[in-house]
Amino acid sequence: MNFWYSRSKIAYLLLPFSLLFWLISTIRRFLFQSGILSAYKAPVPVIVVGNLSVGGNGKTPVVIWLVQQLQMRGLNCGVISRGYGSQSEVYPLLVNAETDPVRGGDEPVLIAKRAGVPVCISPNRQQAIELLLSSYPCDVIVSDDGLQHYKLQRDIEIVVMDAVRGLGNGWVLPAGPLRELPSRLADADFIIGNGGENVYTDTAMRLVPHYAINLVTNEKRELNAFEQAIAIAGIGNPDRFFKMLQDEGIRLVSSQAFQDHQKFSADLFARFAPNVPLLMTEKDAVKCGRFAQQNWWYVPVDAEITGEKSAALLDKIEQMTQQGK
């Protein structure tokens, strides 16, 4: 919402509701931190990857990057997620690359596919962890989102933020885009700026596209082979995806932004010209395989996070798994 990024009249009108939201969330956090309400402590280290603001910060690529980096160090990882948008009949649910994204959720299926890691979804994070640990030998649990889920104790907090949009107008919902006040960042262990750095971040992340993959044939094609294309995106920040394609020299005949976690059907794509290549995100592609056309392609991206601080973070996690808790 545009008014989240300025202190407009609409934002001021919503400010009383934001004060109520802040009061409730602050009391709730205090109750868990003081021990008045009990929080679950897992028998292995728990790393939470989340964000302070809503929508499109690049959290999922960071989860995939983190899991892959820890796997390279010989650690067995498990991922838990609330499974937003999933329609499973039962929770907790173990998710793999072949799970129907309608049941498992688009992001959990994508993580399982890209990282080859066991994923468990449930609104109850404790149940998700317990099922993972009883099913797989996990050395560490990575929580996809859940920064504000204080029922779960965590060993490390990683916050991902859009370095361009920042924290918007600095107000909490609904007057602003924040779930908690900016001062909450002081408690985070590591802050990643998607697209650059700012005063809050420890390091920057680039989302790097390498090629496009055909949804039907799995053919890989360099992005510079696409002179023009139609682009669609059902993610938190679709404009970032469209700009990335344009930066690669692709002329967009048209672009269509859908809601985050959009449920796709063949009918939604009937409007697009069949003779023009259609490019989509990998997150969207996991939901389109059953009705994909020959000229549909998805563009996987890799999170590029470097520097001494990111290496120190990985060292710290590895040491936790060796020393116990």
From Swiss-Prot:
GO terms for cellular component: plasma membrane. ATP binds at residues 53-60. It catalyses: a lipid A disaccharide + ATP = a lipid IVA + ADP + H(+). Pathway: Glycolipid biosynthesis; lipid IV(A) biosynthesis; lipid IV(A) from (3R)-3-hydroxytetradecanoyl-[acyl-carrier-protein] and UDP-N-acetyl-alpha-D-glucosamine: step 6/6. GO terms for biological process: lipid A biosynthetic process; lipopolysaccharide core region biosynthetic process. Its EC number is 2.7.1.130. One of its GO terms (molecular function) is tetraacyldisaccharide 4'-kinase activity. It comes from the Bacteria. InterPro entries: LpxK, P-loop_NTPase. SUPFAM superfamilies: P-loop containing nucleoside triphosphate hydrolases. Keywords: ATP-binding, Kinase, Lipid A biosynthesis, Lipid biosynthesis, Lipid metabolism, Nucleotide-binding, Transferase. PANTHER family: TETRAACYLDISACCHARIDE 4'-KINASE, TETRAACYLDISACCHARIDE 4'-KINASE, MITOCHONDRIAL-RELATED. Belongs to the LpxK family. NCBIfam families: lpxK. Transfers the gamma-phosphate of ATP to the 4'-position of a tetraacyldisaccharide 1-phosphate intermediate (termed DS-1-P) to form tetraacyldisaccharide 1,4'-bis-phosphate (lipid IVA). This is Tetraacyldisaccharide 4'-kinase.
